[in-house]
UniProtKB/Swiss-Prot annotation:
Family: Belongs to the intron maturase 2 family. MatK subfamily.
Pfam families referenced in this protein's UniProt entry, alphabetically: Intron_maturas2, MatK_N
Sample GO molecular function, one term: RNA binding
Protein name in UniProt: Maturase K
Database matches in InterPro entries: Domain_X, Maturase_MatK, Maturase_MatK_N
DNA-binding keyword on record: no
GO CC annotations on file: chloroplast
Gene Ontology process terms (BP): mRNA processing; RNA splicing; tRNA processing
Length: 512
């Protein structure tokens, strides 16, 4: 980031908020491809005679690409000039792909610089490495959700109109040429589509340039949450003094505090309708959860607020059925691969007063997380480890590997799943997953050696797999002191790790 600031100050771009000239800097494209500055021009898929700079990145090539983007149908030339023009035959999407890769780096600079400057002003840089873990959310839910009454499971709506995204970025990027280029990339790259949707064209866009796609999606979510947070803090009895909720940690790791929000004159008259001192909000993937200790009427008001926000501010229709209001403890929801609920658990205590004894039974809610075995089996079946009934099958694609590589792959998958699901309140489902993976591994090895599973296991012994399928309690016994907790009690308690920064690929197969 200091390197970025040096380039900006040297070129005089920082004071004027100009980002467009950075598109012509060679180091931007080196960073986009995660390579050094002395990489040859093959990164641009062009020969050196076109780039004009031999074995270095060419700003001349970038200028030519941008010029051809602005000139409609400029890539169509006559056959007579094809020998002199090396650009003939390129698809127009090639130009957008090359420019958008550098554009994704450039548009992140204002956000990153403001984040660094805000941290320096506070002079307190907290170590948030542990907060980046996915498991860091669950202790928060355990502490808060057990005292709440209602929860709303909200599906963040789409599509997002492309012009709305440009207007959102306009509050941060005060560079008109950059915004014009962004509009051109949007409308031409999407072949006339005016919105980002989860269809095939949007998938291709996210596949070609996932960095820019995630940046645009995060910008849209920041706008939604900033307005919601403004209303929540303005209506709350216990107003917070800082704004620091966690973002999706992709290329920028915080939110800015100063958000410009336009309010109408009678806005304060309606704030009392939303006063709730116990409102909690958590977002994950394309969904969010809003829980409250208030009444059902209050949750319906928040639901109406979200629907009107998406329709009036973002200009697209949002169906009220996207927001489901449910009451604890009669509700379970999928959250990051876990089936979460807040059941009421009874506990009894015997009390004696004089000659009379009493049995006191108390009911306390407790946040629980469990593994939903049916979606997990479906995920394993999709990955070709078993069929839809949960019966293990061989993995023919891995039969050409060595025995140690096959066992290592199966063992690594199980250890990763066991590590991710260590927070489950009931770990019996892990034994079912272990059974499927172990037998699938044995059948893959038997298929490779043209033998039966029974004969293969009798020849090598069941201890052959123990080294590769080390259970979580065995790992804990090596890490924790023997006198800290009983091992059987520790294996039943949820354990949250602070080193998990991504969801397991098999968990991603769930229809969340």
């Amino acid at each position: 980031m200091e390197k970025f600031k040096g380039y900006l100050q040297k070129g005089g771009f920082k004071q004027q908020h100009f980002l467009y000239p950075l598109l012509f800097q060679e180091y931007i494209y080196a960073l986009a491809h995660d390579q050094g500055l002395n990489v040859n021009a093959s990164t641009f898929n062009e020969p050196p005679e076109i780039s004009g700079y031999g074995n270095k990145y060419s700003s001349l090539l970038v200028k030519r690409l941008i010029t051809r983007i602005y000139q409609q149908n400029s890539f169509i030339y006559s056959v007579n000039n094809s020998k002199q023009n090396r650009f003939v035959g390129h698809n127009k999407n090639f130009y957008y792909k090359m420019i958008s890769e550098g554009f994704a780096i450039v548009v992140e600079i204002p956000f990153s610089l403001r984040l660094v400057s805000s941290r320096k002003e506070k002079k307190e840089i907290t170590k948030s490495q542990n907060l980046r873990s996915i498991h860091s959310l669950f202790p928060f839910l355990e502490d808060k959700f057990s005292h709440l009454n209602y929860v709303s499971d909200i599906l963040i709506p789409y599509p997002v109109h492309l012009e709305i995204l440009v207007q959102i970025l306009q509050c941060w990027i005060q560079d008109v040429p950059t915004l014009h280029l962004l509009r051109l990339i949007f409308h031409d790259y999407h072949n006339g589509s005016n919105s980002i949707t989860p269809n095939k064209s949007s998938y291709g866009f996210s596949k070609d340039n996932p960095r820019l796609y995630r940046f645009l999606y995060n910008s849209y979510v920041v706008e939604c949450e900033s307005i919601f947070d403004f209303l929540r803090k303005s209506s709350s009895y216990l107003r917070s003094t800082s704004f620091g909720p966690l973002l999706e940690r992709t290329h920028f790791y915080g939110k800015m505090k100063h958000i410009g929000v336009t309010c109408c004159n009678d806005f304060q008259k309606t704030l009392w309708l939303f006063k709730d001192p116990f409102m909690h909000y958590v977002r994950y993937q394309g969904k969010c959860i809003m829980a409250s200790k208030g009444t059902h009427l209050l949750m319906k008001k928040w639901k109406s607020y979200f629907v009107n926000l998406w329709q009036c501010h973002f200009h697209f229709w949002s169906q009220p059925s996207r927001i489901h209001i449910n009451q604890f403890p009669h509700f379970s929801f999928y959250f990051l691969g876990y089936l979460s609920s807040v059941p009421i658990n009874p506990s009894s205590a015997k009390s004696k007063m004089l000659e009379n004894s009493f049995l006191i039974v108390t009911f306390t809610p407790k946040f629980e997380t469990m593994i939903s075995i049916i979606p997990m089996i479906g995920s394993l079946a999709k990955a070709k480890f078993c069929n839809l009934s949960g019966n293990p099958i061989s993995k023919p694609a891995w039969a050409d590997l060595s025995d140690s590589d096959i066992i290592d792959r199966f063992g690594r998958i199980y250890r990763n799943l066991s590590h991710y699901y260590s927070g489950s309140s009931k770990k019996q489902s892990l034994y079912r997953i272990k059974y499927i993976l172990r037998l699938s591994c044995a059948r893959t090895l038997a298929r490779k050696h043209k033998s039966t599973v029974r004969a293969f296991l009798q020849r090598l012994g069941s201890e052959f797999f123990e080294e590769f399928f080390m259970e979580e309690d065995k790992v804990l016994s090596l890490i924790l002191p023997r006198t800290s907790y009983p091992l059987h009690q520790l294996s039943r308690e949820p354990i949250w790790y602070l080193d998990i920064i991504r969801i397991n690929d098999l968990v991603n197969h769930f229809d969340l």
